[in-house]
């Protein structure tokens, strides 16, 4: 179930502060964050945010189509290596 519209979008305060500093300084350095639950805001468009996927930080360039989605949607946490091979076919 989506978040109530009367509550508004959620963004961690420490991430919001880093985004505001990057916009004020016109910084192009990636912003490192562990906050996968934060919603992409219009202020973030054009910034590179390094989102933690549980093992490393994945750099993601934010564009207009990502606004309203959560940061965690853009850093995949699971890697599918394929199903196990059929042992009968090897005989």
Curated annotation (Swiss-Prot):
InterPro entries: Ribosomal_uS19, Ribosomal_uS19_bac-type, Ribosomal_uS19_CS, Ribosomal_uS19_SF. The keyword Chloroplast does not apply. GO terms for cellular component: cytoplasm; small ribosomal subunit. One of its GO terms (molecular function) is structural constituent of ribosome. The keyword Transmembrane helix does not apply. One of its GO terms (biological process) is translation. Keywords: Ribonucleoprotein, Ribosomal protein, RNA-binding, rRNA-binding. Pfam families: Ribosomal_S19. Protein S19 forms a complex with S13 that binds strongly to the 16S ribosomal RNA. Belongs to the universal ribosomal protein uS19 family. This is Small ribosomal subunit protein uS19. It comes from Halorhodospira halophila (strain DSM 244 / SL1).
